[in-house]
Design a protein with these regions (language model features):
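General marker for long, soluble alpha-helical cores
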Residues: 1-212
């Protein structure tokens, strides 16, 4: 019969394994501890419920044993390496969405938001199009400050995950202006089989956190 110490060590090794197997490093990595803490601390309980509903539905996760379910990071123990990498980035995105929410007023005051078609943005937003706030976010020029760069990065991250979902992406209807006067070069950055589930999860991230 295994002891409590042995079970705790097994759980620790499982968590460490998932971290090691997260093969895709990104700008989000340094902020994952806080994102994980916020998530496990039920900072957004409704969001947590909906995200996991999508994870279990689309990623086909197996229920955890009662023993493992007592661990503070139990929600992440059964993720495959690919699933863990995906979910890790989504948690990072949740953390950055909070930053966007608390700092967008600063950018508005500094007149750093530039959209060629403000009328077009308002039309999309009033129609409930969830791409609009993302477009608004990435319209922030990536200035020299670390905070500005991170806010710009989350817009890039979310847009690259979401823009491929529509036959005629909203992004094509906008011209974004940056300091270098260039337009954005979008690419397919994820496995096509993951796009729909990521879209669903990100949609709930945006709705539940009510950014903007």
């Amino acid at each position: 019969m295994t002891t409590d110490a042995t079970r705790s060590e097994q759980i620790r090794q499982t968590v460490d394994r998932n971290f090691r197997l997260s093969v895709h490093s990104s700008f989000l990595d340094p902020y994952l501890p806080k994102a994980l803490h916020n998530f496990t601390a039920l900072k957004h309980p409704r969001l947590k419920f909906k995200v996991f509903a999508h994870l279990f539905r689309h990623l086909k996760l197996k229920p955890l044993s009662e023993e493992l379910s007592q661990h503070p990071y139990c929600d992440f123990l059964d993720l495959s390496p690919q699933q863990w990498s995906t979910f890790k980035n989504l948690l990072g995105a949740l953390y950055f969405l909070d930053e966007v929410k608390t700092t967008i007023g600063y950018f508005k005051k500094k007149l750093l938001l530039e959209l060629i078609s403000e009328k077009g943005y308002d039309f999309a937003l009033h129609r409930g199009n969830l791409y609009a706030p993302i477009l608004k976010t990435i319209a922030i020029p990536p200035l020299n400050g670390e905070l500005e760069q991170r806010i710009h990065a989350v817009g890039k991250f979310l847009t690259e995950y979401l823009w491929t979902q529509q036959p005629e992406p909203l992004i094509q209807r906008f011209v974004l202006k940056f300091n270098n006067k260039s337009t954005w070069n979008f690419q397919h950055v994820i496995d096509p089989h993951l796009q729909q589930q990521l879209f669903n999860i990100c949609r709930h991230l945006l709705k539940e956190t009510e950014v903007f």
